[in-house]
């Protein structure tokens, strides 16, 4: 009932300085089209109406409810936690260009511009409805970020063009084959001295069997077909296959920035 109004608001002129570039010819990966992710009809990429923003609006509220508010009032805790981790472990790191892969509604994209105001912040996603909503949302917050509809397996950015490449719970939403391609793209796009961080829920090896079993419920009951395997990835092996030095790969448990700030 609210969709027409939401579309109209999202299309209204904005002035924060961010951009939105859509590609109607982009082929949506089969790992999106073959299953309704999170049991949402049509997943997040399907266009229900012209200039659709429904998927973004639903996700914005839905993820808050799903996480029971633990991602913070702006749903940005994952991005905030990466930033806090970087400030603690690499205090002198000051990225000038930042790329968020699978940015969805840009919840975790926005904090990078707030914390690194001199940086150019870009986000990519395959889902146009999510990107339209993300653009309208970030502009309404007065935060200029640059969003484009691209597959993270093959992007149009120049080699070595980003100092920081991040993703926020993207890995368990993509296939193993796609993740290998994404890692190779990260290697191509990363500037010398740059950092790649893929933030995910804890690996199964970091929890007891019961907790792993409970979390694995999502694989079969929340249309998360890649959940199980993604939580068994070996970072050094994935880094080496993509062309990175495995000795420089790392795996860390970063505390919640939202919880720490309470």
Predicted regions and their residues:
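N-terminal auxiliary segments of SAM/dcSAM-dependent transferases
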Residues: 1-50
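Conserved alpha-helix/loop element of class I SAM-dependent methyltransferases that forms part
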Residues: 58, 72-94
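Conserved class I S-adenosyl-L-methionine
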Residues: 94-104
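Class I SAM-dependent methyltransferase SAM/SAH-binding core
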Residues: 99, 107-154
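A short acidic, Gly/Pro-enriched loop at the edge of an enzyme's catalytic core
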Residues: 153-165
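A short SAM/SAH-binding and catalytic strip from SAM-dependent methyltransferases
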Residues: 163-177
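A short glycine-rich, Lys/Arg-flanked "PGG" loop and its adjoining helix->strand segment in the class I
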Residues: 180-192
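C-terminal alpha-helical "lid/dimerization" subdomain adjacent to the S-adenosyl-L-methionine
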Residues: 197-253
